[in-house]
Amino acid sequence: MNAGPLPEHLRRVHMVGIGGAGMSGIARILLDRGAQVSGSDAKESRGVLALRARGALVNIGHDGDALDLLPGGPTVVVTTHAAIPKTNPELVEANRRGIPVLLRPVVLADLMAGYRTLMVTGTHGKTSTTSMLIVALQHCGYDPSFAVGGELNEAGTNAHHGSGDVFVAEADESDGSLLQYRPNLIIVTNIEADHLDHFGSVEAYSAVFDEFAETLGSEGVLVVCLDDPGAAALARRAHERGIRVRGYGSADQAEAGDVPVAGQLRDWQFKDTGATAQIQLAGESAPRTMRLSVPGRHMALNALAAVVTAAEIGAAVDDVLDGLAGFEGVRRRFELVGSVESVRVFDDYAHHPTEVRTVLQAVSGIVAQQGFGRSVVVFQPHLYSRTAAFATEFADALSIADLVFVLDVYGAREAPLPGVTGALIVEQIAGAPVHYLPDLSTVAQQVAAATAPGDLVITMGAGDVTLQGKEIVRALRARANDWPPPGNGR
């Protein structure tokens, strides 16, 4: 299998919100496959500049006239559910002209036609797992096409039109649109309550994963993390329905019941900001060593998913492990922003309580390994609905850190809810010193003033908290000369 000619309806495409993580990736692939692409975004960005350099015509601001950027106008207009309201002037103009408006997942599904399609979904870990699989396959000599929700540090991009017959992509479950896809293999990392503003109940949210598993053809494979209760339950249901399931995790075959275990994580240990793990693959007599440059048990599990999947499609395991050893991570996934003396500043996209807990456990492990310093988190809640629903859980997770700074809520697409601010989380944090910083202009200075040699600082959230990392590094440099030597008095 391989991609055929670009579908006629995708020859001239206008994309509303073209600079977003998901939309920019689609634009890159369209351009690489010969499409004419125009688009609009609210502001200039690195993504917009990169697309312009590749030939896209991009308007800053939203205006119906943007549909005239391409000679003859677009054959379709592409948008997303989450970020673009139906009242957007470009969508209104497209409807007036009778130009079809397609959602991003529909276009991605069209672009994946003809490939062996490997998709990664789950509440957490999608981007990291997808990226690990891509890097592993590239190291094995594959040239997969891919579309991922973050920028791979190795490739410097979030999408690529490859020469091979494999397409690797992230399947976002947040609005149920993943049901547009018809993959050959699905990885499910975990399933727990999220996006209840769309689904209304945990049951409805979980059901979309069952429906997605049903899209696998008779030769399809479902790769599932058995350490996660929600994903393990899905694996059992799918296995009972005759879907070919391959489990991975800490469980051995006896613990997994009837679900076949393809890969077992037997042991893992921190190694600075990386890890070394022992894994046992089905059918092999001895465990293998897996080395990673990214920290945390959750990352070891994500890497194991990539190993199991790559082996499933015929990749050599030794080459897969070599590729994973060189995996440099993904932008905004435990990304090193900078270091000043012995203080390191990282940035992470974590915006759900489980993600926050998992990342902070990894941070605490790194700090404990170095023997001095503290874990310092700067957290920005994302969405009023999520903050209201999970304030207690966020507080519990943040309490893992030694020092906590909480910013106000980044509302994104939502209007404020009465009484829902960052203070709702702050008042429930116990066991760690906590500071509420609703004024973003004061964050960098206050964090730097509270930081000491050996501390590991991490900014965390899905909003503009990511901009604070560089500001904190600058503020730390301004006061570094006043610090005592690392570990002094600690």
Swiss-Prot record:
Cellular compartments per GO CC: cytoplasm
Family: Belongs to the MurCDEF family.
Coiled coil (UniProt feature): none
Keywords annotated in UniProt: ATP-binding, Cell cycle, Cell division, Cell shape, Cell wall biogenesis/degradation, Cytoplasm, Ligase, Nucleotide-binding, Peptidoglycan synthesis
Superkingdom to which the source organism belongs: Bacteria
Chain's role: Cell wall formation.
Organism: Mycobacteroides abscessus (strain ATCC 19977 / DSM 44196 / CCUG 20993 / CIP 104536 / JCM 13569 / NCTC 13031 / TMC 1543 / L948)
Pfam family for this entry, one: Mur_ligase
Recorded metabolic or biological pathway in which this protein acts: Cell wall biogenesis; peptidoglycan biosynthesis
An annotated Gene Ontology molecular function: ATP binding
Enzyme Commission number(s) of this protein: 6.3.2.8
HAMAP family assigned to the protein according to its UniProt record, in alphabetical order: MurC
Entry-linked NCBIfam families: murC
Name of the featured protein: UDP-N-acetylmuramate--L-alanine ligase
Gene Ontology biological process terms from the UniProt entry: cell division; cell wall organization; peptidoglycan biosynthetic process; regulation of cell shape
Keyword field contains Cytoplasm: yes
PANTHER family from the UniProt entry: UDP-N-ACETYLMURAMATE--L-ALANINE LIGASE, UDP-N-ACETYLMURAMATE--L-ALANINE LIGASE-RELATED
Gene3D superfamilies: Mur ligase, C-terminal domain (3.90.190.20), Mur-like, catalytic domain (3.40.1190.10), NAD(P)-binding Rossmann-like Domain (3.40.50.720)
Reaction catalyzed: UDP-N-acetyl-alpha-D-muramate + L-alanine + ATP = UDP-N-acetyl-alpha-D-muramoyl-L-alanine + ADP + phosphate + H(+)
InterPro entries: Mur-like_cat_sf (IPR036565), Mur_ligase_C (IPR004101), Mur_ligase_C_dom_sf (IPR036615), Mur_ligase_cen (IPR013221), Mur_ligase_N (IPR000713), MurCDEF_pg_biosynth (IPR050061), UDP-N-AcMur_Ala_ligase_MurC (IPR005758)
Record keyword Cell wall biogenesis/degradation present: yes
Positions with a binding annotation for ATP: 122-128
Subcellular location: Cytoplasm
